[in-house]
Curated annotation (Swiss-Prot):
Major site of localization recorded for this protein: cytoplasm
Keywords: Amino-acid biosynthesis, Arginine biosynthesis, ATP-binding, Cytoplasm, Kinase, Nucleotide-binding, Transferase
Any Gene Ontology biological process: arginine biosynthetic process via ornithine
Organism of derivation: Syntrophomonas wolfei subsp. wolfei (strain DSM 2245B / Goettingen)
Entry protein name: Acetylglutamate kinase
Known EC number: 2.7.2.8
Length: 287
């Protein structure tokens, strides 16, 4: 028991310089993957976020919700079609997406943060014209899939100023008041740039970027922007990792200090990344 207590003390001491460095800083967390569907992991993510707030950081949560959307569409007998990883979103699907993300998933995260001792406010990108969007596809084949045109940080600033953690659903609004379904990674990157965040953390279902996915020891701990193009050509950055790396590149070239792709299946992965010397996952830097 004495050893255990000493180990806990050492962990706190190791975290001290990071707590000092990130006091008052903004960290955008893209919350998705297994960490949203596994109850134990979900609770640990909520605890991580609340702890960050209590040690003086300003976490900003952007969430996905693909599995929940799939469940609701299936229940209603609506089939989903995907093109290059994006859900084709017609009017009926858009209505369901907005309902599930803004009305169900968002509020569950807010409730989870409150249950862990924190204070949160759930908002959609439509609130306060937070995320202004336009169609991602000019041909119209993707329906109401959107791209971020502009982020208005005023509402997020007000939420933070009043001591709350912003929890943001990735729904945008167009000039014609049309709702748009936007990839949560893209929204997180755009918000990180707009808020001049020090970190962007993407929770995924993989350890990070792997030189060889079949080799668990081939994790690329640091990825430089200058290396990305070659890695794409070599097939090292492929599949679902392509848009995540692109989001990280957009963020760090837009002024965000560091971006991280980490394994949300690891308990307390956010704390391990931010408050330990070793960190986890892949850090993308503008070098």
């Amino acid at each position: 028991m004495i050893v255990s207590a000493m180990e806990k003390a050492e962990i706190l001491v190791e975290a001290l310089p990071y707590i000092k460095d990130f006091y008052g800083r903004r960290v955008v967390i893209k919350y998705g993957g297994a960490a949203m569907t596994d109850c134990e992991l979900k609770q640990k993510v909520m605890q991580d976020i609340v702890l960050m707030k209590f040690v003086g950081m300003h976490p900003i949560v952007v969430h996905g919700g693909g599995p929940e959307i799939n469940q609701m569409l299936s229940r209603l007998g609506i089939q989903s079609e995907f093109v290059n990883g994006f859900r084709v979103t017609d009017a009926a699907t858009m209505e369901i997406v907005e309902m599930v993300l803004g009305g169900k998933v968002n509020k569950e995260i807010v409730a989870g943060i409150h249950a862990s001792g924190g204070k949160a406010v759930g908002i959609s990108g439509k609130d306060g014209m937070l995320i202004q969007a336009h169609p991602a596809d000019g041909s119209g084949k993707m329906g109401f899939v959107g791209e971020v045109q502009y982020v208005n940080p005023e509402l997020i600033e007000k939420v933070i100023e009043n001591g709350y953690i912003p929890v943001i659903a990735p729904i945008g609004i167009g000039e014609d008041q049309q709702s748009y379904n936007i990839n949560a990674d893209l929204v997180a990157a755009a918000i990180a740039v707009s808020m001049k965040a020090d970190k962007l953390v993407l929770l995924t279902d993989v350890p990070g970027l792997m030189m060889n996915p079949a080799d668990s020891n081939s994790l690329i701990s640091v990825l430089k922007v200058s290396e990305v193009e070659n890695y794409v050509q070599e097939g090292i950055i492929a599949g679902g990792m392509v848009p995540k790396v692109q989001c990280c590149v957009e963020a760090v070239t837009g002024g965000v200090g560091r971006t991280h792709i980490i394994d949300g299946r690891v308990p307390h992965s956010i704390l391990l990344e931010i408050f330990t010397d070793e960190g986890i996952g892949t850090m993308v830097v503008n070098e």
